[in-house]
Design a protein with these regions (language model features):
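Active-site clefts of carbohydrate-active enzymes
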Residues: 49-63, 144-176
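Helix-enriched interaction subdomains in cytosolic or periplasmic regions
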Residues: 175, 179-189
Length: 189
């Protein structure tokens, strides 16, 4: 479940400034693009760039989140390159892409660009957690399964799913089999 986990330490901040310098060689253009002159938050030199955590500028916060997702993609690409040097031709590379979470998997994971990160994988892998018992609808399995299948335009592996005995999570008799068939019906191997 590799994602950015809110990484924002000093090294990441410095890397973000370098990323912005490359994207906006003219600091005046950067200030205009992000509305920093208007909000009296102008950055006069790159060396004076403030810590971006807690910024009131949503455009800047969104660009930093985009950069954090880029770091995840670079990290996974680096890992996949290492593994590629050691794996046999019949072996594959995967990673556990998870989804946003509110009591269960509900949609896109905001801390990783799964489509970009999956490029270095051989097979998409995911975890899909969904309600059980009378709350099981199949919506989470279908929605997250569709995302997973589209990462590589192929079938995917379910690396984790709902199979524990937590209160109200324990499936009804036969429901675990139903869930497995639902994953298969949505493109899981």
């Amino acid at each position: 479940e590799t994602k950015s986990y809110g990484t924002a330490g000093p090294r990441v901040q410095a890397m973000f400034v370098d990323y912005l310098k490359e994207k906006y060689p003219d600091i005046n253009e950067f200030n205009r693009e992000f509305g920093l002159d208007y909000w009296s938050n102008r950055v006069n030199t790159w060396e004076d760039f403030p810590d971006v955590r807690g910024t009131i500028n949503e455009s800047l916060a969104a660009e930093f989140a985009k950069f954090q997702r880029l770091l995840v993609t670079r990290f996974l690409t680096w890992q996949a390159a290492i593994v590629s040097g050691y794996k046999r031709p019949d072996q594959f590379i995967t990673q556990n892409f998870d989804y946003d979470w509110t009591d269960h998997s509900i949609g896109y994971q905001p801390e990783v660009n799964q489509y970009e990160a999956a490029r270095c994988m051989t097979v998409a892998g995911c975890d899909i957690y969904h309600p059980s018992q009378s709350l099981l609808t199949g919506e989470e399995i279908t929605f997250c399964g569709n995302i997973s299948r589209n990462l590589k335009k192929d079938n995917y592996l379910v690396l984790e799913t709902q199979a524990q005995g937590n209160i109200a999570w324990l499936p009804y008799p036969g429901q675990l089999r139903l869930q497995a068939y639902s994953h298969i019906a949505n493109g899981s191997n």
